[in-house]
């Protein structure tokens, strides 16, 4: 059985979030939670929340055991980019892009489904 969770519009750039997601790809849930807890970044905190929600979905909806769950698939897609302006000296204006991400994590209790 498989359960997933999607967090859309996370306030973290996709490039920075992918570095943390690569650490836990294909690992079991307990190991992944330990790795994310010891990684001190905003992206790891958001990924940890999405992982905990995916595990809760698997336990509640499918009746799976938390100890058997493995991260079968996880990816980050770019979200909406907010464009903000910042005023500088001598009537100069610079544009700053605030990038967002869509974080998707799928957990499975079958080891064969995990890639």
Where are these regions (language model features)?
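Ribosome large-subunit tunnel/peptidyl-transferase-proximal elements
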Residues: 1-76, 98-115
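A short, conserved strand-capping beta-turn/loop at the end of a beta strand
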Residues: 76-88
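C-terminal structural segments of small proteins and small subunits
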Residues: 85, 91-102
């Amino acid at each position: 059985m498989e359960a997933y969770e999607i967090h859309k519009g996370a306030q973290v750039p996709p490039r920075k979030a992918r570095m943390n997601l690569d650490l836990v790809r294909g690992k079991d849930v307990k190991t992944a939670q330990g790795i994310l807890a010891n990684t001190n970044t905003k992206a790891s905190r958001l990924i940890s929340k999405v992982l905990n929600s995916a595990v809760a979905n698997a336990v509640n909806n499918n009746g799976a055991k938390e100890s058997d769950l493995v991260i079968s698939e996880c990816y980050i897609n770019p979200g909406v980019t907010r464009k903000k302006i910042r005023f500088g000296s001598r009537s100069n204006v610079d544009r700053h892009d605030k990038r967002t991400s869509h974080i998707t994590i799928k957990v499975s209790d079958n080891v064969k489904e995990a890639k």
